[in-house]
């Protein structure tokens, strides 16, 4: 199994796919959401992975990557991504991030813009947004009642939001993925204490061509997508109809078309 060994000693698991009929071109890195892993990109492997060199990486504490005691804040994830790209000798790349991965991707674009060819933010949250206030309740549960209780609370809360009842197969996939995730993130003694500067006033500093995607039923993220659309200088926004939070799984064909067209336009 391929792992990238970071200078910190943490190993990140990843899977890489090369296009069948063309040169590899500029690679694409995919970042998954919280309590998920590379498997959430299943339908992108089938389509985007055939057109572009595509790398799907598990964040630490997720999937098959290592689970250190601490170091799960956004700034830490940004540095992990830099080290990961250096290990794979990726001088410049496209970056697609979903939810937590979108936050990481935005942080990376603000810190290391020279490494990015394009930026795609899917159902991505803005740091310090009011959305995170309810997450702090889970941090309290983790500290007072234990990581296992917090993970179950997250699962019970998020499943109806991630996968509505009518999307039975998506729901099964999501449930299993969340159940499979380690408890390390919840056990982090610094959980809830990482400081991340508000993104709102920094969005104008994003110099990378950006594509913002959200599902029309994902109201709070549609709101954040509107803020990004207003403030990021070079940006396009797509609101996917009949979709909630899990756009890449709920509307894979439409998502793939939008992502591929954006990758093609920004690869020149």
Task: Describe the predicted segments one by one.
Residues 206, 212-214:
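Short beta-strand/loop motif that positions the catalytic acidic residue
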Residues 106-111, 116-147:
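Flexible "cap/lid" loop of the alpha/beta hydrolase fold
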Residues 219-224:
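Conserved alpha/beta-hydrolase "acid-adjacent" motif
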Residues 235-268:
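Catalytic active-site module of serine/aspartate enzymes centered on a nucleophile-bearing elbow/loop
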